[in-house]
């Protein structure tokens, strides 16, 4: 959903920041999410085999009873191998019915789909998520970059990155804007990817 853009004839490009709340308010976010999943899988099939696609799932979409069949269907109709699909969920998706959530994540993972925890460090952050759920990637929120040139924020960011890496997860830091930030987060080797 984060790359979703609407080219409005009068307003120009409308960003997901504006689209998503309207879709949620109108009860369209699940249908929109399903369309995005299918479209993303089909588009990824046009790309080189080494390239994968990450698709954000809203909490409403993730908690649909048919989420597993929707993912299977998108993979089947597109022909995309499951290992080329990464599903990004936020911490709010992990808050409700944790046993069922764990089961769904485990089944997605057994299909070969990769699971990422997006925007880690905001909202209801809990280190227990890193331990209790079958995640493969943690995406540390851009807010951790604020004041990164001083010791305390950098130590916190590196600590979360090291902990995640030690648990066998890939680590992404979101919101990288300068070479200095990239150098600071890359220094100890825990961060595997940077997202600008």
Residue ranges, per PLM feature:
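Short acidic-capped amphipathic helix/loop micro-motif used as an active-site/signal-coupling element
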Residues: 8-13, 37-41, 119, 196
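Flexible loop/coil segments at beta-strand boundaries within sensory signal-transduction domains
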Residues: 9-11, 46, 107, 178
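Residues at alpha-helix caps and immediate loop-helix transition turns in enzyme cores, especially N-
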Residues: 15, 66-68, 100-101, 126, ...
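The catalytic core of metal-dependent phosphodiesterases that act on cyclic dinucleotides
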Residues: 3-4, 74-148, 161-196
């Amino acid at each position: 959903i984060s790359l979703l853009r609407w080219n409005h004839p009068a307003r120009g490009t409308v960003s997901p920041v504006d689209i998503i709340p309207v879709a949620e308010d109108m009860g369209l976010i699940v249908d929109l999410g399903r369309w995005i999943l299918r479209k993303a899988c089909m588009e990824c099939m046009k790309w080189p085999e080494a390239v994968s696609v990450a698709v954000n799932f809203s909490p409403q979409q993730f908690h649909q009873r048919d989420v597993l069949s929707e993912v299977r269907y998108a993979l089947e109709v597109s022909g995309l191998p499951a290992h080329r699909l990464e599903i990004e969920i936020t911490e709010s998706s992990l808050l409700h019915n944790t046993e069922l959530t764990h089961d769904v994540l485990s089944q997605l993972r057994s299909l070969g789909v990769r699971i990422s925890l997006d925007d880690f460090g905001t909202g209801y952050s809990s280190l227990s998520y890193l331990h209790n759920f079958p995640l493969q990637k943690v995406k540390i929120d851009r807010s951790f970059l604020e004041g990164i040139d001083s010791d305390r924020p950098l130590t916190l960011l590196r600590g979360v990155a090291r902990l995640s890496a030690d648990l066998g997860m890939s680590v992404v830091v979101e919101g990288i804007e300068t070479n200095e930030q990239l150098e600071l987060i890359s220094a100890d080797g825990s961060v595997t990817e940077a997202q600008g």
